[in-house]
């Protein structure tokens, strides 16, 4: 029913994916959701916004270089090589040449583990390649800015990453925000201290991981 937190996303996903050109997808993403609040007042998540971000990135990159340039090939593929990821990431799904940002990647389990582990380390290849102010906030390393409240006081969203305050579950003496990635259908990738990672992929709509984190904390303290 409409009480499902994913209803808005589920209800309109097929109509977006069925569009057969990049232009049609962009028009759909721009017009599909009626403006209900002034910008900055109400936090709303739609994966179609990541498509729009990808279109903007491609346009920016081509204006900076030339019309044949491609931000995925030119920027991301070299980063994937540096991270030692598998060749399945070399070519994303596309729509008339535009990377299908938001949905278009195929990854091996080892790719997930490598990316997540590097993200959770304070010093990694991402230190050189990403805007450090935005990255630190996304990784919850900037206590003054935890991000937008999402559903409850223990959940935040910041620069593309979710975060959960695990302090009450783990009985920490102070806040312990764990960044995590969440994917459609039942995907969770939780970034733990010092390069540790918990990830779970399913199609069953299961997003719970607090019990697992509590168990991991008993063997390798997270607080």
Where is each model-derived feature located?
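Active-site-proximal binding-pocket segments
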Residues: 74-140
């Amino acid at each position: 029913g409409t009480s499902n937190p994913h209803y808005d996303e589920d209800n309109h996903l097929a109509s977006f994916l069925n569009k057969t050109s990049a232009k049609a997808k962009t028009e759909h993403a721009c017009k599909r959701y009626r403006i209900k609040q002034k910008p900055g007042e109400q936090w709303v998540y739609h994966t179609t916004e990541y498509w729009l971000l990808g279109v903007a990135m491609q346009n920016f990159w081509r204006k900076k270089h030339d019309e044949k340039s491609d931000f995925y090939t030119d920027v991301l593929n070299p980063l994937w090589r540096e991270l030692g990821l598998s060749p399945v990431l070399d070519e994303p799904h596309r729509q008339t040449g535009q990377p299908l940002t938001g949905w278009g990647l195929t990854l091996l389990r080892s790719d997930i583990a490598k990316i997540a582990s590097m993200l959770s380390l304070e010093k990694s290849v991402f230190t050189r390649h990403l805007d450090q102010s935005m990255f630190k906030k996304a990784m919850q390393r900037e206590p003054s800015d935890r991000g937008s409240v999402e559903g409850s006081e223990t959940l935040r969203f910041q620069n593309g990453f979710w975060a959960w305050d695990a302090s009450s579950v783990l009985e920490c003496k102070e806040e312990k925000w764990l960044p995590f990635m969440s994917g459609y259908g039942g995907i969770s990738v939780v970034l733990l201290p010092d390069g540790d990672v918990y990830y779970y992929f399913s199609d069953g709509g299961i997003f719970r991981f607090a019990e697992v984190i509590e168990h991991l904390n008993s063997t390798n303290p997270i607080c």
